[in-house]
């Protein structure tokens, strides 16, 4: 399902006054059915009350879809409604918060604006804070998106980012980067970074569970014999560690994982080999 323009939709002034052309940052005029850039002439439709700043069709996610909770700390910040928050990649939030603009590339239950995080359709220095949870691994150019966030934040504005490090492939094909701490700091090097730490939802135990679940799911999808699936599930961390330390032969199930189809191996591979030629 994709959106189509609705000429009888209006934008509230509180939202319209935040918006700018994503291409040139020019002022936008009009509010019934479409917005027009007064500088470059770009035209952007309003669909069901939501300004659309993408050129391609936009999918509508069923209203009953609910994304993962933000967690008490960030929900309390939004509940207080202090200052204006931009929530990038908000997904299907459990509730709508005042003074929070939900930004997405699909239309979810509370989406306010549709666009591209690499070219935010907002004026300079209008937000007091930005939340971006589990977004940056899905961006083609994280450094550019970071620069855009910095542009739309007020001086002293706050940023909270959660992003992947050791995570299997998810939301394919738009999972581009898993970043080390050094990588995350590089993306946001123009900010005054206060800390870059492992939050509770990214602890090693969660990572281990995510990887193990992905491996077992890949075996099931491959149609591997139940004996092979059970063999892998029954191995211990100690067996794999001893193998890595080159003290023992491969654990039971090693060959079953080695025999997975290439597309299934890509979900949780240690790395990739690329071969190319100059075109």
Explain the meaning of each model-derived region.
Residues 22, 128-131, 150, 185, ...:
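Short, surface-exposed helix/turn micro-motifs that flank interaction/cofactor sites
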Residues 42, 119, 137, 167, ...:
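Active-site micro-motifs of SAM-dependent methyltransferase domains
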Residues 94-96, 140, 169:
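Glycine/Thr-rich phosphate-binding loops of Rossmann-like dinucleotide-binding domains
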Residues 125, 140-144:
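Short N-terminal helix/helix-N-cap motif within the alpha/beta-hydrolase-1
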Residues 133-136, 162:
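Residues lining the SAM
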Residues 143-144, 148, 154, 158-279:
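S-adenosyl-L-methionine-dependent methyltransferase catalytic module, highlighting the catalytic core
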């Amino acid at each position: 399902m994709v959106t189509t323009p609705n000429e009888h939709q209006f934008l509230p002034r509180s939202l319209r006054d935040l918006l700018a052309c994503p291409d040139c940052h020019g002022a936008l005029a009009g509010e019934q059915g479409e917005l027009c850039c007064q500088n470059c002439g770009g035209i952007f439709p309003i669909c069901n009350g939501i300004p659309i700043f993408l050129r391609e069709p936009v999918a509508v996610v069923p209203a009953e879809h609910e994304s993962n909770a933000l967690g008490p700390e960030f929900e309390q910040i939004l509940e207080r409604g202090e200052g204006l928050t931009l929530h990038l990649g908000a997904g299907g939030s459990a509730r709508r918060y005042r003074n929070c603009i939900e930004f997405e590339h699909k239309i979810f239950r509370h989406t306010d604006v549709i666009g591209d995080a690499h070219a935010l359709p907002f004026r300079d220095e209008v937000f007091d804070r930005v939340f971006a949870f589990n977004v940056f691994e899905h961006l083609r150019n994280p450094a550019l998106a970071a620069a855009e966030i910095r542009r739309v934040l007020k001086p002293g504005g706050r940023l909270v980012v959660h992003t992947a490090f050791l995570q299997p492939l998810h939301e394919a094909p738009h999972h581009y980067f898993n970043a080390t701490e050094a990588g995350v700091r590089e993306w946001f090097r123009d900010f005054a970074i206060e800390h870059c730490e492992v939050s509770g939802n990214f602890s090693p135990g969660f990572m281990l569970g995510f990887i193990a679940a992905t491996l077992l799911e890949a075996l099931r999808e491959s149609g591997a014999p139940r004996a092979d699936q059970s063999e892998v599930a029954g191995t211990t961390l100690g067996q794999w560690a001893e193998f890595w330390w080159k003290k023992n032969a491969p654990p039971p199930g090693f060959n079953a994982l080695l025999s997975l189809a290439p597309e299934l191996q890509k979900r949780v591979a240690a790395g990739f080999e690329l071969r190319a030629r100059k075109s």
